């Protein structure tokens, strides 16, 4: 079935990047549950995204599926939302709600008057739409998959 094939493809991709099988399994169950009513067959890959949103020091690849848009963020050393994406969005800080999973590298997310948090490989994260900033930590590219907020991020 389509949901099973989609989940298998997603599992293989994430498993090649993350070794925590419980987290990978949970993400795939989410996808399976979301698409259990689908009758048609859809398989997409980030190697051939529907859209690429490019900005200084990074890019955001988008694949569109019925009822869901999934994004893959790739940010390079020195990337910071308020410097690199803010000029494109017209807001000082990110106001997009996120649900995703860190694949590689590390990034900090910071809200005003709250302790910053670091997201790394294997972390399943939720970030509210309260204005926040984010930046790459270290020298490695930060890569994450986004299941919520992808339709409007950096658009």
Describe every region a protein language model picked out.
Residues 72-93:
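Conserved short histidine dyad/triad with adjacent acidic residue
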Residues 68, 76-82, 104-107, 153:
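Short, charged/polar surface micro-motifs in flexible loops or helix N-caps
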Residues 92-108:
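Short, conserved beta-strand element in jelly-roll/cupin
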Residues 27, 31-74, 82:
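A short, N-terminal "cap"/entry segment at the start of jelly-roll beta-barrel domains
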Residues 113-129:
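Short acidic-glycine-tyrosine-enriched beta hairpin
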